Amino acid sequence: MTNVPDGLKYTKTHEWYKVDNGIATVGITDYAQSQMTDIVYVDLPEVGDKKKVGDVLLTIESVKSAEDVYSPLTGEITEVNQELTKHPENINKDPYGNWLVKMKVEKEGEYLTAEQYRKLIQ
């Protein structure tokens, strides 16, 4: 069973995010990491990069494929999770604890609630 925590916002392209005080923490869902299997590399963006809703945020490579992760919002990247450059497999272990980037939110895109996302991936 795929883990879909309440209290997060989800996208149809399998990203999650949570906004606190105008800063969004962004990652990929448990469903996404389970489809990719063993993650071996994360190509993180640069702090200061500006992204719009739907832009490619970064790329994650697994033994199975390379997948783009899309920005769920418009804003500037304020922090990247450097730990993932050394240990990309941490995303497989805990996709909600191992966020990818933090962004200053200018505008949110369309999102799904946890309940709506659960229905999408059934």
Swiss-Prot record:
It comes from Thermoplasma volcanium (strain ATCC 51530 / DSM 4299 / JCM 9571 / NBRC 15438 / GSS1). Belongs to the GcvH family. GO terms for cellular component: cytosol; glycine cleavage complex. The glycine cleavage system catalyzes the degradation of glycine. The H protein shuttles the methylamine group of glycine from the P protein to the T protein. GO terms for biological process: glycine decarboxylation via glycine cleavage system. Pfam families: GCV_H. Its cofactor is (R)-lipoate. InterPro entries: Biotin_lipoyl (IPR000089), GCV_H (IPR002930), GCV_H/Fam206 (IPR033753), GCV_H_sub (IPR017453), Single_hybrid_motif (IPR011053). Coiled coil: none annotated. This is Probable glycine cleavage system H protein. The glycine cleavage system is composed of four proteins: P, T, L and H. SUPFAM superfamilies: Single hybrid motif. Binds 1 lipoyl cofactor covalently. The keyword Membrane does not apply. The keyword NAD does not apply. The gene is gcvH. It comes from the Archaea. Keywords: Lipoyl. The modification N6-lipoyllysine is found at residue 64. Residues 23-104 form the Lipoyl-binding domain.
